[in-house]
């Protein structure tokens, strides 16, 4: 399996909100360790937040 494979997943906005909350919680409780993993989590948090904002904008 290629570790650099990209995948597409369909999720509801509720799923995205839950995943965003989970990532935020994990970052708040970060025990230290792999800095690269922490960077990925920050990137994921930003991406998920942009999805939530886009959904809110489109609902106007």
What are these regions (language model features)?
Residues 1-60:
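Positively charged, low-complexity terminal tracts
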């Amino acid at each position: 399996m290629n570790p650099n494979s990209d995948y597409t997943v369909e999720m509801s906005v509720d799923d995205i909100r839950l995943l965003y909350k989970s990532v935020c919680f994990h970052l708040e409780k970060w025990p230290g360790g792999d800095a690269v993993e922490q960077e990925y989590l920050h990137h994921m948090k930003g991406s998920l937040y942009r999805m939530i904002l886009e959904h809110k904008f489109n609902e106007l």
